[in-house]
A protein has these predicted regions:
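Conserved beta-strand-loop-alpha-helix hinge in the C-terminal portion
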Residues: 214-234
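Conserved ABC transporter NBD signature motif
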Residues: 59-67, 76
Length: 245
């Protein structure tokens, strides 16, 4: 039994726009999965369905075999953390450490455990020099790491990262690779939406390719990235990122 499942999921926004149709994904703990596709393919909607920020119009989401139907977003977030593409949509504390520690304290985790999680999160994200800073005084890139650290401190079973490589330099990309591989080695499921094919090739064993609200292909990353016709069909509007030294 897969740990996270989307079974024939559909989602329609109140405006009437249908964002995903018949999406099915099964994922196990320890996997590293990339979700790729052009803008508007349904990637972010699919990710938000995974952690309860959105509820399926039709179909079902299951975590460890249990349907999320009727469960609150906060309950689902204990198991599945979603990190927004834009950190400013997520940060609300005026101190980095307060932001990172908010979720475990909200869930009344004991202080000894909170402190252990904070040390781990800060170490993985390289934020130690900035823990007493106002996150809004940090660069956009570092603010993204603040939100990632907050997710790590929450200690969910599943991490869903939305475009984590956007606006990152080479140092940031290397840091992200280390984080993803460290979490996977601990048995966490890591799902990442990205347009960065180099990052996908270097870090993910499995890739889900989406186009026009559907899944086109779900396979080993090397098979997908070497399928020229699939890349042309699904990623025609995606350009390679510019990496800065």
């Amino acid at each position: 039994m897969a740990y996270l499942e989307l079974r024939d999921v559909y989602f329609e926004y109140p405006s009437g726009h249908v964002a995903v149709e018949g999406v099915s994904i099964s994922a196990d703990l320890g996997e590293k999965i990339a979700i790729i596709g052009e803008n508007g393919a349904g990637k972010t909607t699919t990710a938000k369905l995974m952690n309860g920020l959105l509820k399926p119009t039709k179909g079902e989401v299951l975590i460890n075999g249990v349907s999320t139907k009727g469960k609150t977003t906060a309950t689902i977030a204990r198991k599945v953390a979603y990190v927004f593409q834009n950190p400013d949509d997520q940060i609300f504390n005026q101190e980095v450490l307060a932001e990172i520690s908010y979720t475990p304290r909200y869930f009344k985790v004991d202080e000894e455990t909170v402190n252990k999680r904070l040390k781990k999160a800060v170490k993985l994200t390289g934020l130690k020099p900035y823990i007493n800073e106002n996150p809004y005084n940090l660069s956009y890139s570092y603010r993204k790491f603040v939100t990632i650290a907050a997710a790590i401190a929450a200690d969910p079973d599943v991490f869903v990262f939305d475009e984590p490589t956007a606006c990152q330099d080479r140092h940031g990309i290397r840091l992200l690779s280390g984080i993803i591989n460290a979490l996977s080695s601990e048995g966490k499921l890591v799902i990442t939406i990205t347009h960065d094919m180099e990052f996908v090739a270097e870090n993910f064993d499995r890739t889900v390719c989406m186009a026009d609200k559907h899944i086109l292909m779900d396979d080993k990353t090397n098979r997908i990235l070497t399928d020229d016709s699939l890349m042309e069909l699904s990623l025609i509007h995606i350009s390679e990122p510019t990496r800065h030294s």
